[in-house]
């Protein structure tokens, strides 16, 4: 079923959905951007057409909804623990194909990577549905086609936006019920980006042994250049839809130090101190070493463990956000070239 709705009808649809669902979509945080006169496009709850930013790539990904930047896990009072309440009311997220594909990576990390699933993540994940925002063309720095994340069928509805409104392809009954009486029938089948200006070739395309790739790249000189270029700000990780690193710490209340709460907060493998250990020991002290660790995880180590897909989805946000204009897509191609050269020299 497909229909065409106007901006006013879209707003009415969101109002209907908001009665039961929490609806999140890319929206502008006024003057919250990198410069004083720019907005920050982040995921927020929306109430209508005017709140939605559909013509630009969001600066932050929807993982801020399902894995909040900071959250309380539980409260403690001497010998007792109380699990923090989680709002489990259902959620609808308007997202692009790359970000919907990123959810399978988060699901693996939080639900399958180890013997226990993450309690807080699982509570939210069970109640989330997606509405696909169709990309009519590739944005700057995207390389989703190379990563195989330009397409998805994991959505309840798909929408193609324009200034005149939206074409809607409906797959799930709850969307069909909410949109009842709105719009006009239309001929619409979602389409997906088939090419990007940026293209990458991952190391596993030239070598099928992830340990061999790791051995070749761990001490390769290509990382040395980033010791001076990378400033270790962590912006690439905060914008990434598949990063899952966090720190856990306790907050004791001033009134009674035996009472408090345990929180977890986003962390970054690109920031100094992330790998520090007791006794003053640390790993990856140089920026280039930290970048190597992140790059190998995104396009080698994760797939070696998962066995299905790379962690990187090619959204290009790391390239968009880097103040030093370091291109992750170029790094991937450099990694592949280094592996290809090493294999040729061994032959």
UniProtKB/Swiss-Prot annotation:
One of its GO terms (molecular function) is metal ion binding. Residues 219-251, 302-331 form the 4Fe-4S ferredoxin-type domain. It is found in: Cytoplasm. Binds 2 [4Fe-4S] clusters. Keywords: 4Fe-4S, Cytoplasm, Electron transport, Iron, Iron-sulfur, Metal-binding, Repeat, Transport. [4Fe-4S] cluster 2 binds at residues 312, 315, 318, 322. Its cofactor is [4Fe-4S] cluster. InterPro entries: 4Fe4S_Fe-S-bd (IPR017896), 4Fe4S_Fe_S_CS (IPR017900), Helical_ferredxn (IPR009051), Sulphite_reductase_A (IPR014259). [4Fe-4S] cluster 1 binds at residues 230, 233, 236, 240. Induction: By sulfite. Repressed by oxygen. Pathway: Sulfur metabolism; sulfite reduction. GO terms for cellular component: cytoplasm. The keyword ATP-binding does not apply. Its main location: cytoplasm. Electron transfer protein for anaerobic sulfite reductase subunit A. The anaerobic sulfite reductase seems to consist of three subunits. This is Anaerobic sulfite reductase subunit A. It comes from Salmonella typhimurium (strain LT2 / SGSC1412 / ATCC 700720). The gene is asrA.
């Amino acid at each position: 079923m497909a229909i065409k709705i106007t901006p006013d009808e879209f707003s009415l649809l969101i109002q209907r959905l908001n009665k039961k669902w929490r609806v999140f979509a890319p929206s502008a945080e006024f003057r919250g951007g990198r410069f004083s006169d720019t907005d920050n496009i982040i995921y927020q709850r929306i109430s209508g057409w005017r709140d939605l930013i559909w013509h630009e790539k969001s600066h932050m990904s929807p993982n801020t909804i399902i894995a909040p930047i900071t959250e309380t896990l539980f409260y403690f009072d001497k010998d007792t623990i109380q699990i923090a309440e989680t709002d489990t009311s259902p959620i609808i997220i308007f997202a692009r194909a790359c970000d919907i594909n990123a959810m399978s990576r988060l699901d693996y990390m939080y639900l399958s990577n180890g013997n226990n699933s993450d309690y807080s993540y699982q509570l939210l994940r069970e109640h989330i549905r997606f509405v696909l925002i169709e990309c009519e063309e590739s944005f700057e720095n995207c390389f989703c086609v190379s990563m195989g994340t330009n397409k998805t069928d994991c959505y309840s509805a798909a929408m193609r936006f324009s200034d005149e409104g939206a074409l809607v392809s409906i797959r799930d009954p709850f969307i069909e019920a909410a949109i009842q009486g709105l719009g006009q029938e239309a001929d619409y089948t979602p389409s997906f980006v088939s090419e990007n200006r940026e293209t990458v070739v991952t190391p596993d395309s030239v070598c099928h042994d992830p340990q061999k790739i790791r051995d070749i790249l761990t001490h390769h000189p290509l990382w040395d250049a980033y010791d001076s270029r990378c400033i270790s700000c962590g912006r690439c990780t905060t914008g990434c839809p598949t990063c899952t690193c966090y720190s856990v710490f306790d907050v004791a209340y001033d009134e009674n130090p035996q009472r408090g709460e345990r929180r977890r907060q986003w962390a970054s493998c690109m920031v100094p101190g992330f790998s520090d250990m007791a006794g003053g020991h640390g790993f990856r002290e140089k920026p280039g070493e930290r970048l190597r660790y992140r790059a190998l995880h995104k396009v080698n180590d994760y797939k070696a463990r998962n066995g299905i897909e790379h962690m990187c989805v090619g959204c290009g946000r790391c390239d968009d956000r880097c103040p030093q204009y370091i291109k992750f897509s170029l790094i991937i191609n450099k990694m592949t070239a280094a592996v290809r050269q090493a294999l040729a020299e061994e032959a």
